[in-house]
Amino acid sequence: RFFQNGWNEDNFHFGSRGLTGYCRQMKPENIEDLIAAISLYRPGAMENNFHNEYVLRKEGKKTVEYFTGTQDILKNTYGVFAYQEQIMQLCRELGGLSLVEADDVRKAMVKKKYEALQQYKERFIPYYRDTYHVTQEYSEIVWDAIDKASTYLFNRSHAAAYAITGYISQWIKVHYPIEYWSVAFKYAQDFDYSRYIAEINKTGMCTVRQVDINISSTDVVINFADKALYWAITGVKQVAEKAATQILKERDENG
């Protein structure tokens, strides 16, 4: 729900404005959606409109279509090319190449080494044509689609690492909101405060309270009973840490 609503403030990787907006659009439902979001919300994929294509197919607003023989490999992304690993699998299954050769194809496509690609293209097209009983023209179309996609696809293993870390970050925010936000505020910049407070108010999982001279300290103070965060004394304009320390000393000594 947090990802779907774009409540991603201070979240690892998902906290950017662009990816937050894409999460609202995509409405991720599982870790696979989060991995896809990381991979598809990138310049190359976006220039080819694959990020929107994924959402439309996911929501059933557009028919999911597969090239012959690609469904098992592309079903998790609704027929959309999303990862470099998919390119390798397609070269292996459709073109009869070894995994080492498939990785060579991936590298050559990314670096646009057309001479190196030619030998693999000459093997891929007839193998795919004869094995899957498609036409020569269709085989060439599929090869060209793979070639085009490979130039901008992201590494799925990297995307998975980012997505899992982002999910863990979000899980902590949901289940331990007071602890999460107390740390977030401690390391936040001044321009972060308003966004953080806005999200806290939207989620309603805890509250941020103004400075209380009897409770507040130099850092945000947690009150578990009230599910509240008390603003730091140093958050008051023109009250530096030295002055705040003197205030706390006076409070401790004289009440």
Segments and roles (model prediction):
Residues 1-255:
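Noncatalytic, beta-rich nucleic-acid-contacting surfaces in large DNA/RNA-processing enzymes
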